[in-house]
């Protein structure tokens, strides 16, 4: 009797509250899927665009939520490590733009290709690398995805051709990847990303021309986050309709803060390219919460109130969360459990990224040429011979 009373007392006092919460989540009957209305895309040289309604399954919703939370927390951890001077050099964060990288990946196949600019952490993750590999690369450790030598911009994954530090230079490369897809007869597309700040680069228009001329399966994607470094799009461009910039290339403007809009637009664009019609252009209207880079506080050319308004009204993670909870695809408690798991994953990765050793100096020349004999590289003080290994 005493044991029974003690057990009842523990339940009433809340000692079993956390396990009970898990039982509640596990036993609740959730919907398998739900249909949502999404914003209609603005179109250029297209008679029809992506659908204005879409179905989200519970499984996909939970996956998207976890991925976006992981990207958000990973970027916030990178911010912390940078301020602690553990991450050094250039570092461009993408928090606020999670619906872009996760939504684009949801609309293509793993065998498709992607190349982007220097704001690349989120795409590196969605292309399949772990948080541990990404943070270790940021801190310059051997366990990083590029052996600690690439840093923030130069990360690689399967069918991901890294970021590019030269503004707009990745766009002709993306057209070249699309050319390889067509030349080799593969049913694949290349997503070629650039920002609104790069949209005025001449090489981009040259890539447009060749892609259209050769009908390459290339999706040109402008991530319009409203500011090129510290310059607003209105001050930098005579026309801010970036989806029309291709002129002879069809385009669509997409709500880049809504992962479902991004997913459906990407599926539409990929199907267009796979059909042999040639390239298509997408403009994702999005927003970055951080400044241009870690050296930019981000409040000298925009107000804190503007940033807060976007956070409160258009945050991509909150938008997905509200949809899932209100349509019985998930519960608040279940999503909180995901948040806890993501935070733990990030902390574990950060510990690895700070404890893993840096690559030794003698490995500086590794992974440059695959089969050439050893060569000499001039060091700071003397000539040092490095091995050339794959």
UniProtKB/Swiss-Prot annotation:
Pfam families: E1_dh. Pyruvate dehydrogenase activity is inhibited by phosphorylation of PDHA1; it is reactivated by dephosphorylation. Its main location: mitochondrion. Pyruvate binds at residues 92, 118-119, 157, 165, 167, 196-198, 225, 227. Phosphorylation at Ser-232, Ser-293 and Ser-300 by PDK family kinases inactivates the enzyme; for this phosphorylation at a single site is sufficient. Phosphorylation at Ser-293 interferes with access to active site, and thereby inactivates the enzyme. Dephosphorylation at all three sites, i.e. at Ser-232, Ser-293 and Ser-300, is required for reactivation. Acetylation alters the phosphorylation pattern. Deacetylated by SIRT3. It is found in: Mitochondrion matrix. Heterotetramer of two PDHA1 and two PDHB subunits. The heterotetramer interacts with DLAT, and is part of the multimeric pyruvate dehydrogenase complex that contains multiple copies of pyruvate dehydrogenase (E1), dihydrolipoamide acetyltransferase (DLAT, E2) and lipoamide dehydrogenase (DLD, E3). These subunits are bound to an inner core composed of about 48 DLAT and 12 PDHX molecules. It catalyses: N(6)-[(R)-lipoyl]-L-lysyl-[protein] + pyruvate + H(+) = N(6)-[(R)-S(8)-acetyldihydrolipoyl]-L-lysyl-[protein] + CO2. The modification Phosphoserine is found at residues 232, 293, 295, 300. This is Pyruvate dehydrogenase E1 component subunit alpha, somatic form, mitochondrial. Thiamine diphosphate binds at residues 118-119, 165, 167, 196-198, 225, 292. Mg(2+) binds at residues 196, 225, 227. Its cofactor is thiamine diphosphate; Mg(2+). Its EC number is 1.2.4.1. The modification N6-succinyllysine is found at residues 63, 244, 277, 313, 385. The keyword NAD does not apply. InterPro entries: DH_E1, PDH_E1_Alpha_Subunit, Pyrv_DH_E1_asu_subgrp-y, THDP-binding. Residues 1-29 form a transit peptide. One of its GO terms (molecular function) is metal ion binding. The keyword Transmembrane does not apply. The pyruvate dehydrogenase complex catalyzes the overall conversion of pyruvate to acetyl-CoA and CO(2), and thereby links the glycolytic pathway to the tricarboxylic cycle. GO terms for cellular component: mitochondrial matrix; pyruvate dehydrogenase complex.
